[in-house]
Amino acid sequence: EESKAKAYAVASEVVESKLFPLTEALTTENRILFDEHIFSLHIYEMEKVVDPDFIYQNVSGLGVGKELFGQFYDLSAGGSTDFRSGNAAFHEMLITDDTKKILSKYDQTGYASDHLPNYTGAYSGADVMPLIRIPEMYYIMAECDPDPQSSAEILDMVRFKRGIASSDATDGGKGYDEPDTREGFDSGHTRRINEVMREYLKEYYGEGQLFYFYKRHNYVTFANCSLVDVRTKYQFPLPENEDMFGITGK
């Protein structure tokens, strides 16, 4: 509980600084929500890295079926107005007779950079890989807040900015901190943790934070996972050269 209190305090300090405001719209000129970046990497000519896989190739492993995509973003239950699932975030591609949703987050079209044809002299977030964005601070607060209703309201601060209506607010009432008995959810975790997980899934699709959330909470499995138990996969195998030469830190 002490570590949760400290995590809440630090995350709250970042939020209250107001240096990284939540964005209320996603456009093709700002697919990665650059103003929300607390820390990110610059990758020169990033389009040469991402375009072959995300733009030009029919790679089924990078696409998600429309039915599963709808489940991820709650499209039939209030999520249809969530801009994180919109046309600036994903595009459709026909792959082996099936329409898939393909991530557009790293598509460099529309950005301004000195090596791109539309450069105007104003930097807009081209060639950037986000590592920490401000929504994660809200999610840390929602996870650590001892008050269930306050936790739900903090989650909704991000959700509402993403276009979800206030009528679809998160329920922080009875059962919020009890094992989640809803169909399709991991009953090994509370409804609070599963609600935070769902927001990580929507917000950080293609960024990597969701993996570490699963790992930190030791999820046995998750939506669309082909394994019954993934826990042995959370620790990556050592690179061969480290194993061979004993550079293991042991």
Regions from the language model: what does each represent?
Residues E1-K66, A77-K250:
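Acidic/polar-rich alpha-helix caps and helix-coil junctions
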